[in-house]
Every structure is written in C-alpha cells, then in structure tokens.
Curated annotation (Swiss-Prot):
Species this protein is from: Staphylococcus saprophyticus subsp. saprophyticus (strain ATCC 15305 / DSM 20229 / NCIMB 8711 / NCTC 7292 / S-41)
Protein name listed in UniProt: Homoserine kinase
PROSITE patterns: GHMP_KINASES_ATP (PS00627)
Biological processes annotated in GO: threonine biosynthetic process
Family that this chain belongs to: Belongs to the GHMP kinase family. Homoserine kinase subfamily.
Presence of the UniProt keyword Cytoplasm in the record: yes
Keywords of the record: Amino-acid biosynthesis, ATP-binding, Cytoplasm, Kinase, Nucleotide-binding, Threonine biosynthesis, Transferase
UniProt pathway: Amino-acid biosynthesis; L-threonine biosynthesis; L-threonine from L-aspartate: step 4/5
Amino acid sequence: MKEALHLKIPASTANLGVGFDSIGMALNKFLYLDVTVNDEDQWSFNHIGPNVDELPNDESHYIYQIAQKVAETYEVELPNLNVEMRSEIPLARGLGSSASALVGALYIANYFGDIELSKYELLQLATDFEGHPDNVAPTIYGGLVLGYYNGDTKVTDVSYIDTPKVDIIITIPSYKLKTIDARNALPDTFSHEKAVQNSAISNTMISALIQHNYELAGKMMEQDGFHEPYRQHLIPEFQTIKGIAKQHLAYATVISGAGPTVLTLIAPERSGELVRALKREFKDCRSELVTINETGVTTKVLYQR
C-alpha cells in the first residue's frame, strides 16, 4: 500500500497598504502538491501546467531544500519522494508563491518525517525562514491575519480579524517583479515623525476593519508611507488602475505584497463592472475576481495499491 499526501495551499496577499510585513490575507488561488515515496535514489519533481514550468526537476528545488533543512533540525531522515506540482499562483507577482511553496515543504517534512509539528510550530518555522509572517500566517491559517516576528526570540505572535465582507479584484501584470528588487527600492530608515504617522494610520485601518467600516479602512490603506511611495514606479499600471477603481467607488487599491499585482477591495454590488472595465483597459494584464480563503492549507492522505 502506497501513501500519497495531497496538499492544497492558498495564495496570499500581504501588506494591505500600511500593514507592511505584518498583515496578510489568504486567497482562493492554490498550489497543489501530490507527494508519494519513490523507489529512486533521489527526489523527483513533475511540474504540470503554467506557473511552475520554469522550476527545476532535481534536488536544487526550493521545496527539497526547505524540507531537508526541517528534517535536519528535527534529526529525522526523509524518504526519497516524487512531488507532482500544479499551481494557480503566478511566480514573482506578489501573491505569495514562495510562501506557499515554503509552507508546502514544511508540511511534506512534517508528514514524511513523522515529526508531529503543530500548526503553531509550523508557523514559527515558516516565519523563521521568511523573516516576517505576512504571507505564511494566512497561508497556514486562512483568513486575515496580523502578526509580529521577534527576531531576537524567534517567536511569532498572530491575531485574527473577521474576514472582510468585500470583493477582491487582482490585476496581474505579465511581467515579474522579484521581491529583492522591490526591497531594494525601500529606504533604510524612517524619521520618528514618519514612523509615528504610519503607525497611527495602520492602527486606524485595523480598527476600521474590525468594525467592518470599509470606507475608513480603505482610506487608511491608501495612505501608506512604508512601501508604496517607493515601489509604485516599478508598476506602471498602478496609478491608472487606482483611478479606474475610484471611478467605480472602490474602497481601496493597493500593491499586493511586493508587486507587481495590484489588489482592489470593493463592495460586491460594484465588483463585476470594475473587473470588466479593468479587463478592457489592460490587455497585457489579467484582472480577475478572487475570494478570500478561510481555511488555510488542507491536507488529505490517500492509500494507493
């Protein structure tokens, strides 16, 4: 009897404007991993469909590297595995593709190494690898998650907000934007005055989200001073998308993660008209309605003869 581990891992959007490196939300676009033990002397990877066709098929694969680091940490040996990989999450577009792969690697190591890590421990590991929880926390738990990673203690604490009752539109450009390039666009420091200002905006946004006051939350999202002023020049479509969204009375339009995907929050009764307007305007981008994922990673184990 052969075991097959099936993982369904959601995409994520990070920051929501001023929640830089600390706020993220899971989305119903998925990375699918089907994992079985093989009879070879090494791991193998089979990539199916777009978004994963450029990835390596050998043990230089990111998922292999992370899984082995986890195995070494817990002093277990993993069997050689075959990983079949399909993905609806485009790479290097600000939708958490690397976080989804990282989380998948942790779940693979946990299962096939029989480590018995809890979700809390998986989150700690994931954040230690990533350096911040904004993508990995919602990927693991689902929903809208706030978190803080203490680099000194290596502990991540998270909190949850009710899923916003809004529609989400993502506009995905055809080009990639590497996170490291988007990081390099940011200033090294902020003045105390700017830090206080951005903290106040972020606090107000969170309070508004808790109260389901999406007009106020959106107003705060669009006043980010942490990253969007320094990254928007890397996304030529950003201001035009923002303008069209405003014409349709959207709550907010922000850069998703490090970009270049642009995320818009809007009332459900207005979302259809807006997404069609964006599709007409941007022939080189893909605009689509997505829903918020509330479950996080789902796992299923099947036994094959």
